[in-house]
Every structure is written in C-alpha cells, then in structure tokens.
A protein has these predicted regions:
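A generic structural signal for tightly packed, nonpolar segments enriched in small/aliphatic residues
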Residues: 1-126
C-alpha cells in the first residue's frame, strides 16, 4: 500500500478516499468494508495511456511529470512499476477534514483507516 500526492482531492473532495488497485479480491473486501464502516472510498483507474507521461527524456523514470495533469493517476502508475509481481493498492490520501462531520472531527484525519483495517481483517481471516 502506498499514499502519495493528495492530487485526487480536487476530483473527489475531502469525504472520499480515492484509491487504485489491481487486486480484485482486495477491491471487493475494501468496498464492502467501506460501506459497513461508513468510511467511503472511491476507486480510480490505472489509465495505461498515461504511462507516456512518466517516461522522461533523460532519467529512467519521471515521478513528477510536467504539466500537472492526472497527478494521482501518474503517481499510481509510477508506483505500480515497483510492485509488478505483487497485488497493489495506492491510496491518494488528502488526510484533512475542512469541517467537522459525524465521526470526522475538523483537522487531520485518517482517511479510509477503518475501511482498510476491516478489509484486511476480512482478507486475513477468510
């Protein structure tokens, strides 16, 4: 699991924890746990055509492509290159609650924490 840019907050706001995963079992467990825990998550796509954005002119790989487009997707694609032999999840966490809400005080917050722990519990005990 990785967290990185926070770039997805522009698309989904502070209430949803955006994530990427290529593991169908984890996705199923996470979506179920998120609903049960009232800890919402939103799956974003690995859009493979954006691989070209992280191909640099000089180095082997570019973790911060110019232009500012698709920052959360390019970050997920970048990290995926390092875990090609393993199931993978990347959460693009914002981690800040701008206003108080039930079970979410204003300020720093562990986005998707309850959902992830419940999903892992389900995966590890089944």
């Amino acid at each position: 699991m990785a967290t990185l840019t926070g770039a997805a907050r522009v698309a989904v706001g502070p209430d949803l924890a955006p994530y990427f995963s290529d593991d169908a079992g984890f996705v199923t467990a996470l979506e179920s746990a998120a609903a049960a825990q009232a800890d919402p998550v939103w799956r974003l796509p690995f859009h493979d055509p954006y691989e070209a954005m992280i191909e640099p002119g000089i180095a082997d790989l570019d973790n911060a492509p110019k232009g500012g487009f698709a920052g959360c997707i390019t970050a997920a694609l970048f990290l995926r290159r390092f875990v090609s032999d393993s199931p993978y999840a990347h959460f693009d966490i914002y981690g800040w609650q701008p206003a108080a809400a039930p079970a979410r005080p204003k300020g720093g917050v562990g986005q998707a924490t309850r959902a992830v722990f419940a999903a892992l519990d389900e995966i590890l005990t089944s």
